[in-house]
C-alpha cells in the first residue's frame, strides 16, 4: 500500500437539504409498507416461504457488505494506515447502515418469535426428534430465545462500533483534535477481536442454521471474505461516482483506487481459497453430516448450475479481470468492475 500522507480535504461541505432529510422517514415508511404487503400477499398465495428466502438473500447481501465496510474502518485504524483516510469516510457511512438494518431484520426475527419455521427448521416443534442425537448437542444454541438475544447483542455491538468511529471522525473534522485519532486507534484493537467473534456467530445464526444438521468451522470465514469483497466494491463505486459528480476530485488519487482494486483482487482470491478449502476438508473427511450439503448443491438439485456458476463468475472472471496493473488504475474499468462484483456478490 502507498504509505503517503493523507491529502488535505478542500472540497466544500456536502449536506442534505431539509427536504431530502424528510424523505428518510418517508422511505422507511414505504419500505415497511412494501414488506408488509409482500408478507400479506405471499401468505395469501402460499408463497411466504419463497418470499422469506428472497428477503434473506437481499438482507444477507446488505448486512455482509456493511460489515465489510466496518471491517475496513477498523483495520485502517488498527494498522494506522494513512493511504485510506479520504475513502474511510465512505466506509464509515456504509457501516452506519447497520443501524437501519437492525429494523430490516424484523421480517426475519419476528417469524422466528412466532414459531414459524419456513427459514429455520430448528424452530418447529419436534425438530429434535427428526434430527436425531446430533441435534441434541445443538439444542441449547438453536433455541428461539437465544437466537433473538444473540441478534440483539450483534446489532448493539455493530451499531456502537459504527457510531463510535463515525462520531469521532466527524467531530475531528470540526475540532481538528488529533487525540480522537489516537483514541480510535487504541480502541480498534479490542474492537477487532469482538467484531471477529460476532461475525463467527452471526454467520452461524443467519445462514448456517438454515440447515441445522450441517456444520463447518470455515463457513464464517467464507461469509467474512464475501462481505469484505462487497464492501470494497461499494467503497470503490461510491468514490468513483462522487468524483464523476464533481466532488473530491483531487482528494482520491489513482494510487488509492489502485490500492482498493488490489484489495478487491486479493479478497476475490481469498474467497475462492476459503470456498475450495471448505469443500476439500469436507470431501476428504467424507462424513455424511457434512457431505450432504455439497451433494445437494452440486449434484442432486437444480442449484448445481448456480454453484458451478459461482466458480466462474465469482472467482475466475474477477480474479483475471483485476490481475493486470493497468486495469486496476483505470477508473472507467474499475467502475464497471465494482458494479460487477456487487452484483455477483448479491
Q: How would you describe each model-predicted region?
A:
Residues 233, 309-321, 344-346:
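Long, repeat-rich segments with strong aromatic
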Amino acid at each position: 500500500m502507498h504509505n503517503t500522507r493523507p491529502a488535505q480535504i478542500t472540497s466544500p461541505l456536502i449536506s442534505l437539504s431539509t427536504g431530502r432529510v424528510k424523505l428518510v422517514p418517508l422511505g422507511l415508511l414505504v419500505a415497511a409498507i412494501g414488506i408488509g404487503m409482500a408478507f400479506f400477499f405471499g401468505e395469501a398465495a402460499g408463497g411466504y416461504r419463497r418470499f422469506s428466502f428472497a428477503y434473506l438473500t437481499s438482507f444477507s447481501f446488505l448486512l455482509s457488505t456493511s460489515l465489510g465496510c466496518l471491517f475496513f474502518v477498523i483495520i485502517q485504524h488498527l494498522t494506522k494506515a494513512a493511504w485510506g483516510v479520504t475513502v474511510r469516510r465512505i466506509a464509515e457511512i456504509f457501516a452506519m447502515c447497520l443501524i437501519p438494518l437492525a429494523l430490516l431484520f424484523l421480517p426475519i426475527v419476528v417469524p422466528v418469535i412466532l414459531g414459524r419455521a419456513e427459514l429455520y427448521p430448528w424452530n418447529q416443534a419436534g425438530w429434535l426428534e427428526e434430527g436425531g442425537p446430533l441435534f441434541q448437542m445443538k439444542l441449547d444454541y438453536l433455541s428461539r430465545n437465544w437466537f433473538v438475544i444473540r441478534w440483539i447483542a450483534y446489532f448493539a455491538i455493530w451499531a456502537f462500533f459504527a457510531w463510535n468511529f463515525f462520531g469521532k471522525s466527524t467531530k475531528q473534522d470540526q475540532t481538528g483534535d488529533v487525540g480522537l485519532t489516537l483514541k480510535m486507534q487504541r480502541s480498534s484493537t479490542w474492537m477487532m477481536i469482538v467484531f471477529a467473534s460476532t461475525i463467527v456467530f452471526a454467520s452461524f445464526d443467519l445462514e448456517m442454521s438454515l440447515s441445522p444438521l450441517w456444520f463447518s468451522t470455515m463457513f464464517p470465514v467464507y461469509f467474512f471474505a464475501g462481505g469484505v469483497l462487497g464492501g470494497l466494491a461499494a467503497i470503490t463505486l461510491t468514490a468513483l461516482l462522487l468524483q464523476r459528480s464533481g466532488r473530491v476530485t483531487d482528494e482520491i488519487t489513482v494510487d488509492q483506487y489502485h490500492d482498493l482494486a488490489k484489495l478487491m483482487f486479493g479478497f476475490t482470491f481469498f474467497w475462492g481459497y476459503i470456498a475450495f478449502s471448505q469443500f476439500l476438508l469436507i470431501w476428504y473427511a467424507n462424513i455424511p453430516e457434512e457431505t450432504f450439503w455439497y451433494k445437494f448443491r452440486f449434484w442432486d438439485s437444480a442449484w448445481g448450475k448456480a454453484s458451478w456458476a459461482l466458480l466462474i463468475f465469482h472467482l475466475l472472471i474477477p480474479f483475471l479481470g483485476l490481475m493486470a496493473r493497468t486495469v486496476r488504475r483505470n477508473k472507467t474499468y474499475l467502475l464497471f468492475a465494482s458494479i460487477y462484483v456487487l452484483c455477483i456478490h448479491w
